[in-house]
């Protein structure tokens, strides 16, 4: 599985950030260009039925090498990187045999990956770790997953003694902006079940996600010359501040963990005449999720009552739901992944995803899709890193899962 690092380093050279602002599919042209390159690579290693559609979805098939009928399994990763930080000119560095100390990512800018802030890195002492130069994210989310899947299926092609059923490979665009499953053709994909490789540290096995929604708050102010503004001006900046402060201050990402939900203020655009707040709303519990959506709407209503006019408009849109209810119907998909990890000396860590994957929506589209680790940490930022061994073990896990299904 040594090819996984070389593949990964090649993939992150391509800037495939998705965009919240774009209405195109995919949201950025570079994703489609990258999809075409991946399609060519899949053909080159010997996969069949390789397709890259106009929306940037890549699909391919590794044909079964056994006579008996077993479930067709899919392995899925996403091609885009987060728009939260630049993915242009990623300049990775391999820290060989990590010594357990702080890692200076950028001496000139004094950007340091500190063990007291990111203690999880100590779990990889003695291993080779890929880090950034402090200027960009790394792109392990989710190009590590792509590299692992392709490396695994190539290994199966080159080792026909390992028996497996039909395997489907899928790569999606725009996962980071919540659109990864929008145009995914489940019927065309043709899998009975699937796994995304979009998780974090080694051993993570996830079958629960948030219920997720986004909220856009538009505030209409009224600008009047400040010298004569008394009882006339409505300052949208101050109304926005009031709105923000009316939501629970401790129910935010930086103060929650585990199964706790939150309101996350993504952006504020504000001036006297108008303001716009963009939130995401998250909770594992469906009832609490619905209550959160009503809560943010209620804030808008209370402000409108105070001003005795409609100056606040709150629009809420669901994004995805907790896939647990669908995964529980086919629990064996989690059990096999669990057993496969044990078989290759990985201790499974069953954790809820404090986020979402393409599998969240695919599970509700008829394709049960739990999530496996891809190996990275600190996604979406300059402190992102991925241990090389974790990527190699993820590729090995894909092979072992395929093998276990063939032996069921």
Swiss-Prot record:
SUPFAM superfamilies membership: Bacterial exopeptidase dimerisation domain, Zn-dependent exopeptidases
Residues the entry annotates as binding Zn(2+) 2: 141, 176, 380
Recorded catalytic activity of this chain's protein: Release of the N-terminal residue from a tripeptide
Keywords attached to this entry: Aminopeptidase, Cytoplasm, Hydrolase, Metal-binding, Metalloprotease, Protease, Zinc
Keyword Lipid metabolism part of the UniProt annotation: no
PROSITE patterns given in the database record: ARGE_DAPE_CPG2_1, ARGE_DAPE_CPG2_2
Binding residue positions for Zn(2+) 1: 78, 141, 198
GO cellular component, one term: cytosol
Gene3D superfamilies found in the cross-reference section: 3.30.70.360, Zn peptidases
One GO-annotated biological process of the protein: peptide catabolic process
One term of GO molecular function: tripeptide aminopeptidase activity
EC main group: hydrolase
Record-listed E.C. numbers: 3.4.11.4
NCBIfam families in alphabetical order: peptidase-T, PRK05469.1, PRK13381.1
HAMAP family registered for this protein in UniProt: Aminopeptidase_M20
Family as reported in the entry's similarity comment: Belongs to the peptidase M20B family.
Protein name: Peptidase T
Native source species: Clostridium botulinum (strain Loch Maree / Type A3)
């Amino acid at each position: 599985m040594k090819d996984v690092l070389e593949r990964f380093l090649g993939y992150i050279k391509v800037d495939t950030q998705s965009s919240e602002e774009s209405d195109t599919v995919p949201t950025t042209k570079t994703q489609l260009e990258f999809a075409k390159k991946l399609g060519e690579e899949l053909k080159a290693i010997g996969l069949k039925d390789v397709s890259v559609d106009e929306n940037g979805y890549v699909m391919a098939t590794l044909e079964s090498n056994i006579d008996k009928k077993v479930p067709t399994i899919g392995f899925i990763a996403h091609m885009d990187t987060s728009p939260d930080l630049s993915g242009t000119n990623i300049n990775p560095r391999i820290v060989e045999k990590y010594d357990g100390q702080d890692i200076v990512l950028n001496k000139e800018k004094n950007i340091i990956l500190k063990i007291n802030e990111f203690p999880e890195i100590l779990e990889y002492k003695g291993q080779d770790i890929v880090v950034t130069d402090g200027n960009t994210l790394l792109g392990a989310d989710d190009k590590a997953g792509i590299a692992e899947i392709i490396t695994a299926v190539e290994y199966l092609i080159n080792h026909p003694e390992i028996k497996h059923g039909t395997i489907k490979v899928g790569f999606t665009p725009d996962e980071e902006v919540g659109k990864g499953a929008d145009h995914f053709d489940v019927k065309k994909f043709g899998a009975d079940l699937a796994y995304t490789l979009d998780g974090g540290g080694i051993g993570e096995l996830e079958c629960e996600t948030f219920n997720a929604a986004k909220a856009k708050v538009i505030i209409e102010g009224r600008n009047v010359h400040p010298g004569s503004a008394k009882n006339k001006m409505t300052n949208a900046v101050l109304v926005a501040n009031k709105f923000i402060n009316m939501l629970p201050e401790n129910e935010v990402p930086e103060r929650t963990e585990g199964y706790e939900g939150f309101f996350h203020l993504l952006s504020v655009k504000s001036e006297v005449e108008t303001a716009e707040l963009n939130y995401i709303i998250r909770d594992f519990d469906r009832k609490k999720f619905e209550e959160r959506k009503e809560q943010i709407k209620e804030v808008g209503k209370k402000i409108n009552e105070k001003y005795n006019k409609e100056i606040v408009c709150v629009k809420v849109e669901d994004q995805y739901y907790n896939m647990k209810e669908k995964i529980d119907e086919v629990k064996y998909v989690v059990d096999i992944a669990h057993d496969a990890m044990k078989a290759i000396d990985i201790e499974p860590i069953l954790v809820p995803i404090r986020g979402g994957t393409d599998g969240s929506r695919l599970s509700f589209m008829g394709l049960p899709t739990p999530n496996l680790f891809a190996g990275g940490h600190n996604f979406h930022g300059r402190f992102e890193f991925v241990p090389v061994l974790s990527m190699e073990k993820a590729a090995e896990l894909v092979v072992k899962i395929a093998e276990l299904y063939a032996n069921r």
